[in-house]
From Swiss-Prot:
The modification Valine amide is found at V9. Belongs to the periviscerokinin family. The keyword Aminoacyl-tRNA synthetase does not apply. It comes from the Eukaryota. Mediates visceral muscle contractile activity (myotropic activity). This is Periviscerokinin. Keywords: Amidation, Neuropeptide, Secreted. One of its GO terms (cellular component) is extracellular region. GO terms for biological process: neuropeptide signaling pathway; regulation of smooth muscle contraction. It is found in: Secreted.
Length: 9
């Protein structure tokens, strides 16, 4: 679970 929501495309 990432602490910061990164847009993984």
């Amino acid at each position: 679970p990432a602490l910061i929501p990164f847009p993984r495309v």
